[in-house]
Amino acid sequence: VCVYDCQYCVNRTSNDLPRAMFTPRELADLTIDFYRRNYIEGLFLSSAVVHSPDYTTELMIRTLTLLREDYGFSGYIHAKAIPGADPLLTARLGRLADRLSVNIELPSSKSLALLAPDKKTDAIFQPMAQIKQEILQSKAERQKFRHAPAFAPAGQSTQMIVGASDETEVGGAKRS
């Protein structure tokens, strides 16, 4: 069960639905099996926040470590960074993924407070700033040292929900 109660999300804590979750090994096994059969070319990894942002990020890191280091997975990986997670965990996630993203969620702090009251704007923008810095640092290191590890080499992206509140798309675009 997700620890957040975002009104727009099916996984919200107040939604009384049966829940299911893959273990890191189950997800890695399923991914590598589909990849070897040419059913998929990559993985988009996102998650509800289970227990805490750190715990959830650690599960994601375990999954990607199994794929990259144990199974030799060379396909594309896009992972969602979890706001509130320890920056060291976000850094580790970015060394395993090709692209990282963070959901802005909603176009304003007002709509965030209304529809996702447990989430805070600053907590959302902190990992976005960290990812930007890590990407710039990684590029500089790779110019000096050819074999320096890459950080999210395909970059960073974001998304937001438009239409769940009174804000316009223009306001949302300015925010991002």
Predicted features, each with a name:
Residues E169-S176:
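Active-site capping/gating regions of soluble enzymes
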Residues V1-Y4, N11-T158, V162-E169:
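Conserved Radical SAM active-site core
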